[in-house]
Design a protein with these regions (language model features):
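Domain-level signal for soluble alpha/beta catalytic cores
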Residues: 1-186
Length: 186
């Protein structure tokens, strides 16, 4: 639909201002697909005066729904008056796809921290409900690969439960940092 830049800024500003009044320290923007939407949020967050982090959701082709690539986002965030303190990817279609995107961010040579928040598996419709098929063990492996791919902020998105997060923490604590993985390994 049609949404003007000014209205998008106003909408993000209203939410960010309320969060600031509520005492938050950092604003978090995620699951964005359009660069215009990301820019409107950046402008609104500048008005509020709080640091922020932002992520986009990338598909199996390494692009957002609106065609943004990891290289595009890495360049885009550096153009804002107040860039995010960290940026990256969330959601998407599975660990291998988000890890490929993280490798794309790292390949740009960014010094800004990279975020990776992958889904716990692939969504399936089962008995009238959405169910994610990822078990905690693969999420632990994902966390290690995300770290080794260059992510500094690692978490989970859709379908991620406390057991997944525990396994991720356990894997990160128990396994030494490794070399940057190849696409074949991912």
């Amino acid at each position: 639909g049609e949404l003007s830049h000014a209205l998008a800024v106003e909408m993000f500003h209203e939410q960010a201002d309320a969060l600031k009044e509520g005492g938050v320290d950092v604003l978090w923007l995620e699951t964005i697909s359009a660069p215009e939407e990301f820019a409107a949020a950046a402008e609104a967050f500048k008005l509020v005066g709080l640091p922020w982090c932002g992520t986009m959701s990338f598909d199996t082709a390494g692009r957002t729904m609106m065609g943004v690539t990891s290289a595009d986002l890495a360049k885009l965030v550096e153009d804002y008056d107040v860039p995010p303190v960290a940026f990256g990817a969330n959601c998407g279609t599975g660990a291998s796809d988000i890890l490929r995107t993280v490798l794309g961010f790292a390949a740009q040579g960014t010094e800004r921290p990279i975020i990776s928040k992958g889904n716990a598996g692939i969504p399936k419709y089962v008995d009238g409900h959405i169910h994610y098929d990822g078990t905690p063990e693969p999420m632990g492996e994902y966390a290690v690969l995300a770290r080794d791919s260059g992510a500094k902020i690692i978490g989970g998105c859709c379908g991620t439960m406390p057991d997944h997060l525990r396994k991720m923490r356990e894997a990160l604590d128990s396994r030494p940092r490794g070399e940057r993985p190849t696409l074949e390994r991912i």
